[in-house]
Structures are given as structure tokens and as C-alpha cells.
Amino acid sequence: RIDEENCCLIANGNIIKVIYANNPDEIDYTQYDINDALIIDNTGSWRDEAGLSRHLQSKGASKVMLTAPGKGNLKNIVYGINHDQILPEDKLITAASCTTNAIAPVLKMLNDKFGIESGHVETVHAYTNDQNLIDNYHTGNRRGRSAALNMVLTETGAAKAVVKAVPELAGKLTGNAVRVPIPNVSMAILMLNLTTPSSKEEINEFLRLIALHSNLQNQISYTQDPDAVSSDFVGSREAAIVDSTATIVEGNRCILYLWYDNEFGYCNQVVRMVFKMAGINYRQYPEEG
């Protein structure tokens, strides 16, 4: 419920204070008994070190996480792949994008097992608030067209961003995106040329075992449902779900279809990173090592 008098949201008995400010460095968190705050910036307004550092000028602020690909030398982290790079002294971290989080774990595992010579990532992505609901002006030409009425061809930085988490894929991937008129759940199509020839059965079994028995259980899930459609994956906690019935393999050529809840699934990745940055460590099964 909403507590307008105290400017709060109350969810399951938890009080969530709403703080208004024009700039990130105007807030005094200690006024609200908040010290050593870990700030999650999902505005997208500041994506480099200089911009995000403005948060740290606020009294009571300690660390900042950006929920978008960062620019410059910021650490771009995909939890499950390179989260061990987060150090206690790090003040600014980025959680990459929902698409990067969806594709990086699968690409990492495939490259380790079979090798990836080259590939293309095509995302069929639910529309976002960056698009217009009706035809109107936009800095990106196609994104100015009505999001609710069109499939919109646009760019994605996910293929390049993957390299910051999986550097061995540098120069091997291209990417593009098609925004479609649904509110949530997207699909990444991985079209890969592998170093080692394989088969549909081998690739699927490899990914199934990873989803069941590896340390990437929270990042990679697996479905054999022949009737699966996008709405089935609303609320999925994993970063991506492999649609095994759609897998295509011909020798060195492999095409994979990954579903992902680009909202809730990504939020779960962000929460895992928050725990890491805050030093909160729950026991994981299977245990690492």
C-alpha cells in the first residue's frame, strides 16, 4: 500500500522510503538512518565513472551499482561468470544488461567445451520505455515508431558487452535486436560456428547437465516443453532458459534459442550482485570447489 503522509511504500510489512531529489549528490541518507548505502542506479542517466561517482558525494552513500552496461573502465559483471572480480574496495560496479546476463553464461560454457569461432546474437526483445507508444520523435529513428504496433529493428550492445565478461570471445560476435509489442520476456537467438563439430543431442545434454548440476544453476535453466511460449517464462528467476526443442546443430553450425524474463530474471541477477558487494554469503548447492 501507499503511505502518502510519510512518503512510503509498504510491501509485505516492509517500509520502503521514497526520496525525491533532482541530482544524486543532493541526498543525505543519514537523515533516514541509512549508513554505508549501496545505491542501485537504474535511471540510465549516468553510465560512466564521473557520473556515477556523484552518488558517492551523498552523505551515507558507500557503493554504487549500475543496472546497464557501463562505459570506460568500469567493471561490467555478469553474476556467475566474472563476479569473482568484485573486490571489497570496489565502489562502482555495473551489472551489464538483461540480454548480456542471458547470453554470457551459455556462451561461456559452449566456448569452454566446443570452442566458438564466430557467431551472431539476435534478440527478440519486449518493448521498453525507451520507445514511443505512438509515432513520435526519437533520437533513434526506428525507436520513434509505435512500440505497441510494430516490430522495431534496432541495435543491441550485448554482443560487445559479453566480451567484458568473457574476453576470449573478443571480435567473434555481432548482434542486433528486434523489439516486439509484448510487455515482458524476450528471446536471444545464438547463431554460432563452433570449433568442434557436435550434434543437437550432445549440445542439449551438455546444457541440461549444466542447468542441473553446475554452479550456474541460477543462470542457466532448461526446458523440453514443445508447447513453450513467451508468457510461460514470466517470473523466471534464472538469467536464461534453453529451449532445447528448438536447438539446431549441423556439424560446426549451432543455433540456440534462449528465453529470458528481461525484468524479473535480470533483477535476480542484480540481487545476487548486491549480496556479493555487501558481503552477504549464503551457502550454495552444489558447493563451489
Report the location of each language-model feature:
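C-terminal substrate-binding/catalytic lobe of Rossmann-fold NAD(P)-dependent oxidoreductases
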Residues: 1-30, 115-118, 123-254
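Acidic active-site catalytic centers that drive phospho-/nucleotidyl reactions
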Residues: 41, 189, 261
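N-terminal Rossmann-like NAD(P) cofactor-binding subdomain of oxidoreductases
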Residues: 1-133, 137-144, 248, 272-273, ...
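A generic structural signal for alpha-helix starts
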Residues: 101, 197-198, 264-265
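NAD(P)-dependent Rossmann-like dehydrogenase/reductase catalytic/cofactor-binding core
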Residues: 234-289
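Generic alpha-helical structural context detector
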Residues: 108, 164, 208, 272-275
